[in-house]
Curated annotation (Swiss-Prot):
Belongs to the PPDPF family. GO terms for biological process: cell fate specification; cell population proliferation; exocrine pancreas development. It comes from the Eukaryota. Residues 22-46 are annotated as: Disordered. Keywords: Developmental protein, Differentiation. The gene is ppdpfa. Probable regulator of exocrine pancreas development. Disruption phenotype: Impaired exocrine cell differentiation and growth. Loss or significant reduction of exocrine cells are due to lineage-specific cell cycle arrest but not apoptosis. The endocrine cell mass appear normal. Cell cycle arrest is mediated by up-regulation of cell cycle inhibitor genes cdkn1a, cdkn1b, and cyclin gccng1. It comes from Danio rerio. Residues 23-33 have a biased composition (Low complexity). This is Pancreatic progenitor cell differentiation and proliferation factor A. Expressed exclusively in the exocrine cells during pancreas development. Induction: Expression is directly regulated by pancreas-specific transcription factor ptf1a. Probably also regulated by retinoic acid (RA).
Amino acid sequence: MAAIPSSGSLIATHDYYRRRIGSTSSNSSCSSSEYTGEVIPHPPGLARQDSGHWWSSFFFGKQNQMGTPNGFESQQKTGTYTVTNGQVTCVAREIVMKRHLSESSDSGKEPGSPLPS
């Protein structure tokens, strides 16, 4: 966690992730020898990535090997996109719309407004 005080400086609230960033600016309020930019240690339960950045998997996920389809290209050809965070996929949305239209035509009602995305 981090806190941002009214001075605008970012301060780590947990010692494990504390990092003091040095400044080469001559008009800095802190001497650069005091704030040298300590390295954040590698968490003990997390495997290291080949890139050297253990945190990269949190932002970028697993990288595909060169020359292999990445899933997005194959999904783009079929027109389907899978969303992993629980949102409705394009295919499911189409099925719901078709079902809604068929149910409303069976009951003699006009189809309602489209489902919100």
